[in-house]
């Protein structure tokens, strides 16, 4: 999670190094033994052209890209269109979606290219910009999840200590982005491009890597330890503690401000005097209990959804966080004989990071009724838009036929109405009393 290499959270650069390739691939020892064009063809065939399992990886990245982009945009649109959804929690969810959109657009394509080709094709400027934006989005996601947990903890466990408002939520979001942009500046400073094939640097950009360049060995270790603690371990521990207390309050204890009746599994209230009919006081007490039950259920649904979001985040970022620490702090994988296995681990870890961005909208869809309704409405509008032209053509084609049928129906209905009127009149006449029958017929 600390940069943009394959060792970094959603890294956007190559984890391989020249010593690794030299120890595992003989052709790199003596590239002068090959003609330049022949050597480049060999590199393309052996390293750059996607293998069978890499096509599966490409398909997985495409699916994640589409789901993450469409899903998170729908989340933002749903909250923007509906005023009743502009709650404090939903403001933070929108901010989380914006961070996911940022990392999906700016970093996912570059990571896929680097994972497949092991080459940074995007130049020195983007070598600094893309890793910086990626780490900023990671920091924004972590801080946003922390603010959500803190807000829910105050609202449920200590409702009288702090009152959260939409204005405070918006101010917190601005602070989150400012802090994230500032603390990730070192990541942009240390990123540099270098080539692993100096002899062919003027002829090809193959095996150009975008990696960190530090002045000493102690600095990268300190940086990555701090990055791991600040952006993963410490926030995760605090959020777990907060949600544990929330779980105890919502599922095991009485929520402050609720009655003991609700706490006792919502047993029905019994009036003291047992009146024959429900009195006004009893009705008001029952209404209050019903409101408390509704509030508890709503809080439980929200807490359950946020706990799942946190759990998925922790699972998706755990592999890359561990691999980064092992690589950067302990120097593992620098000289490895099983290069393909290490490459597979890092590649899968990168995909997991982006899969987290795609998973969040899916979680909202399954665990939030309001978001589910908005997603259905959005897809319904899309489907109606696709079939709108076909329906217009069919409607125009049926116009003449329907008009002819309408004319025939009107004539038929006119005849039927006339016959029905005659039948009703005759029936009413036949049911008249005998004494008045002659007079009625005469008057008619």
UniProtKB/Swiss-Prot annotation:
Regarding the membrane, this protein is recorded as: Multi-pass membrane protein
Q: Where are the transmembrane segments?
A: 55-75, 89-110, 128-150, 171-191, 223-243, 305-326, 343-366
Q: Which GO terms describe its biological process?
A: cellular response to hormone stimulus; circadian sleep/wake cycle process; feeding behavior; locomotion; neuropeptide signaling pathway; phospholipase C-activating G protein-coupled receptor signaling pathway; regulation of circadian sleep/wake cycle, wakefulness; regulation of cytosolic calcium ion concentration
Where does this protein have compositionally biased stretches of type Basic and acidic residues?
Answer: 1-10
Q: Where in the cell is it found?
A: Cell membrane
Q: List the disulfide bonds.
A: 127-210
Q: Where is the composition biased (Polar residues)?
A: 14-27
- Residues the record annotates as the site (Important for responses to orexin) are 44
Which residue stretches belong to region Required for response to orexin-A? 33-49
Q: Which GO terms of the molecular function aspect are on file?
A: orexin receptor activity
Check the record and name the CDD domains matching this protein: 7tmA_OXR
Q: Which residues lie on this side of the membrane: Extracellular?
A: 1-54, 111-127, 192-222, 327-342
Function of the protein: Nonselective, high-affinity receptor for both orexin-A and orexin-B neuropeptides. Triggers an increase in cytoplasmic Ca(2+) levels in response to orexin-A binding.
Which PANTHER family does the entry mention? G PROTEIN-COUPLED RECEPTOR 15-LIKE, LEUCOKININ RECEPTOR-RELATED
* Family per similarity comment: Belongs to the G-protein coupled receptor 1 family.
Protein name as it appears in the record? Orexin receptor type 2
From what organism does this protein derive? Sus scrofa (Pig)
């Amino acid at each position: 999670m600390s940069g943009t290499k394959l060792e970094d959270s959603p890294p956007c650069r190559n984890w391989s190094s020249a010593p690794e390739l030299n120890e595992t691939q003989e052709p790199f020892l003596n590239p002068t033994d090959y003609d330049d064009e022949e050597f480049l063809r060999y590199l393309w065939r052996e390293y750059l052209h996607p293998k069978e399992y890499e096509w599966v990886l490409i398909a997985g990245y495409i699916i994640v890209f589409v789901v993450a982009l469409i899903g998170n945009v729908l989340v933002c649109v749903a909250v923007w269109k509906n005023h009743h959804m502009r709650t404090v929690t939903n403001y933070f969810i929108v901010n989380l979606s914006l961070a996911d959109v940022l990392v999906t657009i700016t970093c996912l394509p570059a990571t896929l290219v680097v994972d497949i080709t092991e080459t940074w094709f995007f130049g020195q400027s983007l070598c600094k910009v893309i890793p910086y934006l990626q780490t900023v989005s990671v920091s924004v996601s972590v801080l946003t999840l922390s603010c959500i947990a803190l807000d829910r903890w105050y609202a449920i466990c200590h409702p009288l200590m702090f009152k959260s408002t939409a204005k405070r939520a918006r101010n917190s979001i601005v602070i989150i982005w400012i802090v994230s942009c500032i603390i990730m500046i070192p990541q942009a400073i240390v990123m540099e491009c270098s080539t692993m094939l100096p002899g062919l640097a003027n002829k090809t950009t193959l095996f150009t890597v975008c990696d960190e360049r530090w002045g000493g060995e102690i600095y990268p270790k300190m940086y990555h330890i701090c990055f791991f603690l600040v952006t993963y371990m410490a926030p995760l521990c605090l959020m777990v503690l907060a949600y544990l207390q929330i779980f105890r309050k919502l599922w095991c204890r009485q929520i402050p401000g609720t009655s003991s009746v609700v706490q006792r599994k919502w047993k029905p209230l019994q009036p003291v005097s047992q009146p024959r009919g429900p009195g006004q006081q009893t009705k008001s007490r029952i209404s209050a209990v019903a409101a408390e039950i509704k509030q508890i259920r709503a809080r439980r649904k929200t807490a359950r959804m946020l706990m799942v979001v946190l759990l998925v985040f922790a699972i998706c970022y755990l592999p890359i966080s561990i691999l980064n620490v092992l690589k950067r702090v302990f120097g593992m994988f620098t000289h490895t004989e099983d290069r393909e296995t290490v490459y597979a681990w890092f590649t899968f870890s990168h995909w997991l990071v982006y899969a987290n961005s795609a998973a969040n909208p899916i979680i909202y869809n399954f665990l939030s009724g309001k978001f589910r309704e908005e997603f259905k409405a959005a897809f319904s509008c899309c489907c109606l838009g696709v079939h709108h032209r076909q329906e217009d053509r069919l409607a125009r084609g049926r116009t003449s036929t329907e008009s002819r049928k309408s004319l025939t129906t009107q004539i038929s209905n006119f005849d039927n109405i006339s016959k029905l009127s005659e039948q009703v009149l005759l029936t009413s006449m036949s049911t008249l009393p005998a004494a008045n029958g002659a007079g009625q017929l005469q008057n008619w």
